[in-house]
Amino acid sequence: MSQAEFDKAAEEVKRLKTQPTDEEMLFIYSHFKQATVGDVNTDRPGLLDLKGKAKWDSWNKLKGTSKESAMKTYVEKVDELKKKYGI
């Protein structure tokens, strides 16, 4: 998986004709963060930040996943979403 393919997918996901589901967005977010930052490096958001907690939890589940693996899974998911929602 090349950085160029990953960067292209990151741009394409912003142009989907229909907004993906929350679950799909969490998947995309967590794999993007794992590919670009690595393991979660922040404290878990507070009790009242439901969206922040969901994003953090989704990313934290990928702890230990390699950058390459996260990039590959991210690109595959974006390709799936492009077929499902169109660009």
Curated annotation (Swiss-Prot):
Binding positions for an acyl-CoA?
A: 14, 29-33, 51, 55, 74
Q: What is its main location?
A: endoplasmic reticulum
Subunit annotation? Monomer.
Which residue positions does N-acetylserine occur at? 2
Q: What's an example GO cellular component term for this entry?
A: endoplasmic reticulum
Please give the name of this protein: Acyl-CoA-binding protein
Mind telling me which InterPro entries this protein's record contains? Acyl-CoA-binding_prot_CS, Acyl-CoA-binding_protein, Acyl-CoA-binding_sf, FERM/acyl-CoA-bd_prot_sf
Protein role: Binds medium- and long-chain acyl-CoA esters with very high affinity and may function as an intracellular carrier of acyl-CoA esters. It is also able to displace diazepam from the benzodiazepine (BZD) recognition site located on the GABA type A receptor. It is therefore possible that this protein also acts as a neuropeptide to modulate the action of the GABA receptor.
Q: Which UniProt keywords are listed?
A: Acetylation, Endoplasmic reticulum, Golgi apparatus, Hydroxylation, Lipid-binding, Phosphoprotein, Transport
Q: Enumerate the Gene Ontology biological process terms.
A: behavioral fear response; hair follicle development; lateral ventricle development; learning or memory; long-term synaptic potentiation; regulation of synaptic transmission, GABAergic; skin development; triglyceride metabolic process
Positions carrying N6-succinyllysine: 8, 17, 55, 61, 77
Please give the residue positions where the record annotates the modification N6-malonyllysine: 55
- Sites where N6-acetyllysine occurs are at 8, 51, 55, 77
**Record-listed Phosphotyrosine modification sites:** 29
